[in-house]
Amino acid sequence: MRVGILISGFGSNMIKLIESCEKENTRASINIVISNNPNAKGLEYAKSKGIRVHSIDHKLFKDRKNFDEAVNEILTNNNIDFICNAGFMRIHGEDFVKNWFNKHLNIHPALLPSFKGLNTHQRAIDQGVKFSGCTVHMVRSGVDEGPIISQAVTSVDSDDNAKLLSARILNLEHRLYPLCLQLFAEDLVSIAQDKVIYTEKALEVLREFKI
């Protein structure tokens, strides 16, 4: 499975996805990294790994549709099968989402459907929730919406601040996202009518992750 990653910055989740695809016996390969930010540091890392990179400055396009079309053209020309957002700070238009329907993952640093959007950690603390975490989900046209593939959970402690909570959740992201990508690469999960279908092997892998 040929994978493209979309980033806007450093792309720490991108790094973990690349590392997971460098292991033996994986059916996924990272074949291109695209950023809407020409100065994204993640581009240099991907390039150092021999991965093709592209920067497409969204500010040079008159609207979202034209930008999406440019991204889609690059993905298509590189025979990409599947996309992962890794800190990609742009909202996709409906046409782009349809083109990559059920072939496009995102990770969000909260337990969806709670705390969609930005500033998730401080909002979770302010609301007094006792648990937070991260969510891997299929991309849909709504912000941080789509079928949930898996979630990882951590406690929100009484002395937490946004920085401390963010660090713990980022550690979970770095483990969960590569795992979910590999589940799709190995055909262990699928989507039917917006419901996630798990094989017994997928359930076993996810249970082991949560232990």
PLM ranges: what are they?
Residues 1-41, 45:
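N-terminal Rossmann-like dinucleotide-binding module
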Residues 20, 82-198:
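Donor/substrate-binding cores of folate-linked one-carbon enzymes
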Residues 15, 193-211:
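Short, basic/aromatic-enriched C-terminal tail that caps enzymatic domains
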